[in-house]
């Protein structure tokens, strides 16, 4: 018999209802805001999307990104790595808790998490090359021991997850226009094939 404080949300008493899973999925979407408002802008220094006019108005980290000098000490790249893996963790957390559960929006939530996890991995791959892959929640100590994947493993993960997401997600959304659709999953899958 496990007893949890009645006024606290814990891992043991959460993920029981459809609404709980919806909140978990929304936490995955919330992590996208971090990515859109900052990290993609910073990565844009590698292209002609952003121009680094002078070091006087910038930092060494941005200069290094602009010149494809990637070091572990680059604070911006470290922040990007941490934030994107946090997004993956959130998706894996929801997916892990969905095993064996029957909820009305199971397919939709699973599809959304698979899509977002693929989004994070795709952008990690484009930014850093092959990276460690975790398909489930992994304790931090164990996560440090996961080796970088091969390109084949990365493409396998992306194509499998996005194909499943495309099948599970609706093609359009009436009331929830800001949520991903099957068409978005097919679009990202096409981008993966073109990369």
What are these regions (language model features)?
Residues 7-10, 68-70, 136-142:
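Short linear capping/connector segments at secondary-structure termini
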Residues 37-43:
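Beta-strand acidic-aromatic groove motif in beta-rich domains, primarily in extracellular
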């Amino acid at each position: 018999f496990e007893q949890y404080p009645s006024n606290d949300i814990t891992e043991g008493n959460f993920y029981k209802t459809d609404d709980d899973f919806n909140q978990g999925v929304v936490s995955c979407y919330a992590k996208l805001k971090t990515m859109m408002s900052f990290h993609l802008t910073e990565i844009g220094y590698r292209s002609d999307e952003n121009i680094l006019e002078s070091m006087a108005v910038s930092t060494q980290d941005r200069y290094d990104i602009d010149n494809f000098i990637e070091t572990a000490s680059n604070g911006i790249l470290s922040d990007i790595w941490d934030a994107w893996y946090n997004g993956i963790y959130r998706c894996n957390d929801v997916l892990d808790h969905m095993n064996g559960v029957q909820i009305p929006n199971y397919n939709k939530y699973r599809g959304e998490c698979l899509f977002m996890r693929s989004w994070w991995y795709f952008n990690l791959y484009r930014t850093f090359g092959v990276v460690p892959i975790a398909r489930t929640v992994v304790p931090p100590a164990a996560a440090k021991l996961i080796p970088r994947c091969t390109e084949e493993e990365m493409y396998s993960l992306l194509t499998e997850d996005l194909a499943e997401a495309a099948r599970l997600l609706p093609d359009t959304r009436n009331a929830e226009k800001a949520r991903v659709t099957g068409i978005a999953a097919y679009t990202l899958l096409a981008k993966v094939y073109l990369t």
